[in-house]
Regions:
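Structural/interface elements that position substrates and couple domains in central-metabolism enzymes
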Residues: 1-212
Length: 212
């Protein structure tokens, strides 16, 4: 399970100073772990971020969805805070329960991680075929199918390497796979993607420390 010691201690400290505090969580926390935090305070709102590291400010302001998970009355207060005091373009906020917000966040991140690996393997096929068109044309054409979208198809990725790395996808994929296992469920596709990614990334001598 995730180590929530810092989150728990910070939450308790805030409640000690102000018992009626509304606590907004931005960190990516698996649903089962959030259940434990509810025992500390019912005034929790989970407001997950959907940011690319390279474009964090831009993505925050232009996020296609802003989710508030938790008690509806409390969540609406946080929503009003956004509406009154932020430059976020999206005004159509989404309200869910706490655990649903976490499930949505992890589903998106791990799907995109799996998508990265899928297109890494399609690139392997591309490189073995005697084709005249470029990889860029291939993925650009595939992306015209709106069901697939155009993101996370570049091989290599934005870091110049194959597979997925950085601060989010590796840790989120492992955490969600472990969460599923603890719940008696199996994320076989994600588990296979993690295994393939580990094999791909192992060829690089230097990696972001956050991947280890």
């Amino acid at each position: 399970s995730q180590d929530l010691s810092i989150v728990e201690s910070t939450t308790k400290m805030l409640l000690k100073r102000c018992p009626d505090s509304i606590i907004i969580l931005k960190s990516t926390i698996v649903p089962s772990a959030l259940s434990k935090l509810l025992k500390i305070s019912r005034n929790l709102i989970y407001n997950p971020e959907f940011l690319r590291e390279k474009y964090a400010n831009e993505d925050f302001v232009n996020s296609p969805m802003i989710i508030f998970g938790g008690d509806r009355n409390i969540a609406e207060k946080v929503s009003k805070l956004y509406l009154d005091h932020s430059r976020c373009v999206n005004k159509d906020h989404i309200f869910t329960d706490l655990l649903s917000a976490a499930l949505i966040k992890y589903s998106i991140n791990t799907f995109l991680a799996t998508k990265v690996i899928f297109f890494n393997e399609i690139k392997d096929i591309f490189e073995q075929l005697d084709v005249n068109d470029s990889w860029e044309k291939i993925i650009r054409t595939i992306s015209l199918d709106l069901r697939i979208g155009s993101s996370h198809m570049d091989v290599p990725g934005h870091d110049g390497r194959r597979g997925f790395g950085g601060a989010c996808f590796p840790k989120d994929s492992l955490a969600f796979a472990k969460c599923a296992k603890e719940l008696g469920c199996e994320l076989s596709v994600l588990t296979a993607a993690i295994k393939t990614n580990n094999k791909i990334r192992s060829q690089y001598k230097t990696l972001d420390k956050r991947e280890s």
